[in-house]
Amino acid sequence: HPLPAHWFFYAGRICQAYLDSHYYQLKREVDSVEKAIKRYLPIFVLPTLAAFIIGFIAPFIMGVGLSFCEFTTVKDAKFVGLSNYVKAFQDTIFRHSFWYTALFAIASLVVINVCAFALALALTRKMRGTNIFRTIFFMPNLIGGIVLGYIWQLIFNGILAKYSTALALNQWLGFWGLIILVSWQQIGYMMIIYIAGLQSIPGEVMEAAQIDGANSWQRLWKVTIPMMMPSITICTFLSITNGFKLFDQNLSLTAGEPSKLSEMMALNIYNTFYGRSGWEGVGQAKAVIFFVIVVAIGLVQLKATRSKEVQQ
């Protein structure tokens, strides 16, 4: 015998009542969580915000202000207008350090990213020991720049001594020494980013390209690299900014020798501020110029690579 129709009606009402009760219970729980978040948000946000303002915003604003002053301490600052900026741009060593740094940033960008991408491709293939190799390649990134600089200085000078020369005697030996050092340190980090990008590519896309007759080289240029643009954007941005901001390795490996010809911008600013009495304001002006250059280059690079992402 078929069940009466009103049985289905009552069963439906019971199910609806059950679901409604759970819905309103869940809604009350969500509302209570939102109220708790709003109530305790200042407790978690304000200390972090205060630390950010005290540790970054306030010193940055103070530094910009001091770039227009002549001073030895903050209390005796005397406003001199754009005089410090004029001296900074007239400093031939500072101008040389800019071009030297720009060349280094471009060269390190190419070397680091080509090697990191090649390693990522190799280590995403099905082979034994990939996790061990990933760890080995990443480990140099954990060592401090100062320590690496002194270690590689001993290595390079030990080799160059056989040819009666040293890093401190030739700016281009120092330049390529820095390229090798920084590449050895950062390739592993960029490799991890590229591996994450490669693993995010859907396997169906690669299979479809292979079925369509694309060889490995065509799949690399037409499929892999276009779909890797987000990872490439991150790595190129990090490589360029790290290249311009390089300080520790430059200080410990070459210290700007010979005659400040291998001195990069960050080291030049440091030597101006702490090494030349009465030039503290000029050093601060150089720091502001340096900040503007790094931000501008970073924004241009991001815009260029982001446009590539959109096109792909």
PLM regions and their residue ranges:
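A structural signal for multi-pass alpha-helical bundles of membrane permease subunits
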Residues: 34-312
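Short, Lys/Arg-rich, polar N-terminal cytosolic tail immediately upstream
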Residues: 18-36
